[in-house]
Amino acid sequence: MTTLVFYQTILNWYHHFGRKTLPWQIKKNPYKTWISEIMLQQTQVKTVIPYYCKFIKRFPNIDTLSDSPLDSILNLWSGLGYYTRARNIYKTAKILKQKFNGIFPNSYAEIIKLPGIGKSTAGAILSFGFNLYSCILDGNIKRVLIRYYSININNKYIEKLLWKTIESITPIYHTNKFNQALIDIGALICLKSNPKCNICPLKSTCKSYLNNKLFQINCKKNKKHIIPKTKYWFLILQYKNYIFLEKRQNLGIWKKLFCFPQFIRQNDILSWIQKNNTKIKKINILNEFKHKLSHLTLYINPIWIIINKISIFSNNNKTIWYNLNNPQCIGLPTPVTKIITKIKKFNTHHE
């Protein structure tokens, strides 16, 4: 297949089958492209869509985003995971407001300097947001290239090789359609396992398909590593319709999110209660549950304590009494949200 035929084949497939109605593809602009690309990092499209729609409705532009508190951004991000992305969005919004007057720069050199934006994301912003020539190398495109050219994934220079490859085949014209087509072929056809080669527009010249190597090629090297496990005790302190939460600081997991007081040892909970002169009305020990992070597996043991009166007062920067009936706009980790939902259901059934 010649280079020209290769382009025409991909663009023709995109015309008939490519995705063109995703929320960030409608009335697209650099801001929408940026937000969607950050959300799509390590997260599937179907998961991102509802989060993206809520986010854009609340923060329709750079100004509204940069003028809002970080807590409101983390609130809409709650449940999406990888919260560093949200914190980087906030940092970038501030930079764009202060340095670029709220206008997204169309220079690769400027975009690549912004927090949380790497080479491929910068390329996506330029290609999809500005309709400029720029290469993209996300996980989907990597998979297509590795299979199409039958690239050895054990090559220690594979990243450089893939960039060199995509740079050599990305056309100057209709770059955005070409990029989106490769992404879609990777996402819809050239799957991690059980690729749908029978409907792939590139199968007639795909080296892996022709050499029957499809199931020997993965886009990631197989790395065997043991994910550490940690046990946490969560103290759920409730007074009427309020629950006590602490803001996590800059160390460890869930930075800047609000969480129940956490303990490594169960005995530390008693010490905490005594230290804060907490008057206990009732204690409920909830079932342990597992929560997986990318680098850690947590075994969470919630202890739910009903108290007679508040002995700890809110400090807006560090602690709050979370209103179950009228929740504050703050970021919450998924395990905290799950527990709060259970408590609200329990309270509703026992009113």
From Swiss-Prot:
Binds 1 [4Fe-4S] cluster. The cluster does not appear to play a role in catalysis, but is probably involved in the proper positioning of the enzyme along the DNA strand. It catalyses: Hydrolyzes free adenine bases from 7,8-dihydro-8-oxoguanine:adenine mismatched double-stranded DNA, leaving an apurinic site. The record marks D138 as: Transition state stabilizer. The active site is at E37 (proton donor/acceptor). InterPro entries: A/G_AdeGlyc_MutY (IPR005760), DNA_glycosylase (IPR011257), Endonuclease-III-like_CS2 (IPR004036), Endonuclease3_FeS-loop_motif (IPR003651), Endouclease-III_FeS-bd_BS (IPR004035), HhH-GPD_domain (IPR003265), HhH_base_excis_C (IPR023170), HhH_motif (IPR000445). Its EC number is 3.2.2.31. Adenine glycosylase active on G-A mispairs. MutY also corrects error-prone DNA synthesis past GO lesions which are due to the oxidatively damaged form of guanine: 7,8-dihydro-8-oxoguanine (8-oxo-dGTP). This is Adenine DNA glycosylase. It comes from Buchnera aphidicola subsp. Baizongia pistaciae (strain Bp). The gene is mutY.
